């Protein structure tokens, strides 16, 4: 009998410049959406434990980019950043973690909608970016720390226009933070088999996140933030990072609320598999144990290629052992130390019982019809034939449950509605609610973008511009129309309110009650938002009987 692990690592297998000036200039449209900027050696100066940083002011928001929060040697845990003299210029994004060729460039249409900014890579990438309404003013504002997506293999704190924190900081009087950390082989290659020196190598990317939170705890007051009111939120791989930090002992007390967007990670790598990937990587590099330190000097490109080869090898071995191979990739490992246990299996982490959570997904996530144009006009009969490939003799059960959950569905919904992220999100919410501690709130983002004839629907990442109140800034994805702007105002208010109080209820939205397994209250975000109760309970029961592998 095959052994299947419930894990949000499935999404890891699917996913993966600034302008400045001297004094009151207009930033070119190519760099941003416009607005007055003030930048000089005496403006926007804040003091950190490492030294002073100089940012700039845009539309009343103080902005700092590329501020070092730590430093690290390859495969080693992070340590305090070097101190500096004078004022460090912090007006441009710092380096991003080196990573493989972007997996997301499927088409010109996708490039247009997402409008990625990959920045420039360097292993010295441990940087934070900060947007705040005030510095050195004695105020204590809620802090919202965004963890980027891309699984644990790719991404950065600047990669999407949606990530810009100006509008969210200004609207909510909050401090917004994004950051970069080590990814892929640099952050999660487990070399613990080669001695104590490399004992934590498989989790240094996770330790980077902890180091960033520790830095914020010590320094955010200088940027007008309240270290005792920190919310971590992230999407896709970023949601997985949030899930994992909730179970990381060294992160306890460094944040107080958590939001998981399309990235509920219940399980992550087990040490026996991460070590196999590590040893297979070393073998692929042609190194022996006695020469392991040479791995420090091997080029990144060679290292990554060996790591990817090792992952493929271990996946193939796992298939023969009856283990679902899609769970293997770059990710934190349960090492008994940095991460003592699985994040949400068999239960929610006790250390985070009193941390309120929001959990949700988009209705379509990795929309099949986006990438297979013929599916956009698919008939019900054709859709059913695709369903039979997965659900076989239970296809009729699936159809009946689907019609109950989504009575106004179109034929393409049968293959577009997400069943990769939603089941894990519901399970995570149930586990959190079962703790009977702080509440958990559930949402489903169902708004569909009109861009490019609606080809993206409510795809993966679609909710991010709404959360950051960047619907106009990221109009290539949202269209930037009146309906999108109205929903963006409501959703960003909900996220701000949650960061401030742990309760997301906001004007313009129906009363939002906490999720329980019995009622399954879920906020459907759309032009007309509504609360639904266990709408897809029967449908998920059918879906869970089958491996999450798509069609």
What are these regions (language model features)?
Residues 239-251:
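Short glycine-enriched nucleophile-adjacent loop
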Residues 16-18:
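C-terminal motif of bacterial Sec signal peptides marking the signal peptidase cleavage site
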Residues 114, 218, 252, 261-382, ...:
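Substrate-access "cap/lid" subdomains that shape
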Residues 223-235:
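Alpha/beta-hydrolase fold nucleophile elbow
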Residues 125, 199-221:
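Alpha/beta-hydrolase active-site loop
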Residues 67, 423-551:
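Mobile gating loops/cap/lid regions near enzyme active sites that modulate substrate access
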Residues 20-203, 227, 326, 477-491, ...:
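Non-catalytic accessory segments of hydrolases
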Residues 149, 204-208, 236-239:
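Active-site loop->helix "elbow" adjoining a glycine-rich segment at hydrolase catalytic centers
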């Amino acid at each position: 009998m095959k052994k299947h692990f419930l894990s949000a690592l499935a999404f890891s297998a699917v996913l993966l410049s600034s302008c400045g000036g001297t004094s009151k200039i207009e930033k070119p449209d190519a760099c941003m959406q416009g607005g007055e900027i003030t930048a000089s050696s005496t403006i926007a100066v804040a003091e950190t434990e490492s030294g002073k940083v100089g940012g700039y002011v845009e539309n009343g928001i103080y902005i700092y980019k590329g501020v070092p929060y730590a430093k690290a040697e390859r495969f080693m845990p992070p340590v305090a950043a070097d101190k500096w003299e004078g004022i460090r210029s912090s007006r441009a994004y710092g380096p991003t973690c080196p990573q493989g060729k972007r997996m997301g460039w499927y088409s010109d249409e996708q490039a247009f909608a997402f409008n990625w900014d990959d920045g420039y890579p360097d292993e010295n990438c441990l940087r934070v970016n900060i947007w705040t309404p005030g510095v050195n003013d004695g105020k204590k504002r809620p802090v919202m720390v965004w963890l980027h997506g891309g699984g644990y293999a790719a991404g950065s704190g600047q990669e999407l226009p949606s990530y810009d924190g100006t509008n969210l900081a200004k609207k909510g009087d909050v401090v917004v933070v994004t950051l970069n950390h080590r990814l892929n082989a640099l952050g999660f290659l487990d070399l613990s088999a080669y001695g104590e020196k490399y004992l934590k190598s498989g989790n240094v990317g996770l330790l980077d996140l902890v180091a960033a939170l520790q830095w914020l705890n010590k320094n955010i007051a200088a940027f007008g933030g309240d270290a005792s009111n920190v919310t971590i939120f992230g999407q896709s791989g970023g949601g997985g990072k949030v899930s994992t930090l909730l179970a990381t002992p060294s992160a306890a007390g460094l944040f107080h609320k958590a939001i998981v967007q399309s990235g509920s990670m219940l399980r992550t790598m087990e040490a026996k598999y991460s070590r196999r990937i590590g040893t297979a990587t070393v073998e692929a590099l042609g190194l022996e144990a006695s020469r392991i330190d040479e791995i420090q000097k091997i080029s990144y490109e060679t290292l990554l290629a060996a790591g990817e080869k090792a992952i493929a090898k271990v996946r193939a071995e796992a298939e023969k052992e009856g283990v679902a191979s899609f769970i293997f990739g770059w990710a934190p490992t349960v090492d008994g130390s940095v991460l003592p246990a699985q994040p949400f299996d068999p239960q929610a982490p006790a250390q985070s019982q009193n941390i309120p959570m929001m959990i949700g997904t988009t209705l379509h996530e990795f929309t099949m019809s986006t990438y297979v144009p013929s599916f956009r006009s698919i008939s019900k009969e054709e859709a059913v034939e695709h369903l039979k490939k997965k659900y076989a003799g239970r296809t009729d059960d699936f159809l009946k449950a689907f019609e109950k959950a989504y009575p106004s569905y179109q034929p393409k919904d049968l293959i577009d509605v997400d069943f990769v992220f939603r089941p894990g999100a519901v399970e995570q919410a149930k586990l959190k609610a079962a703790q009977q501690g702080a509440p958990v709130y559930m949402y489903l983002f169902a708004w569909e973008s009109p861009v490019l004839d609606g080809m993206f629907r409510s795809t993966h990442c679609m909710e991010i511009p709404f959360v950051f109140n960047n619907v106009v800034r990221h109009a290539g994805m949202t269209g930037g129309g009146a309906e999108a702007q109205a929903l963006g105002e409501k959703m960003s208010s909900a996220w701000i309110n949650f960061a401030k109080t742990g309760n997301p209820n906001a004007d313009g939205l129906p009363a939002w009650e906490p999720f329980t397994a019995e009622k399954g209250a879920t906020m459907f975000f759309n032009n007309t938002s509504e609360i639904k109760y266990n709408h897809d309970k029967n449908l998920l029961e059918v879906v869970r009987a089958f491996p999450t592998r798509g069609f």
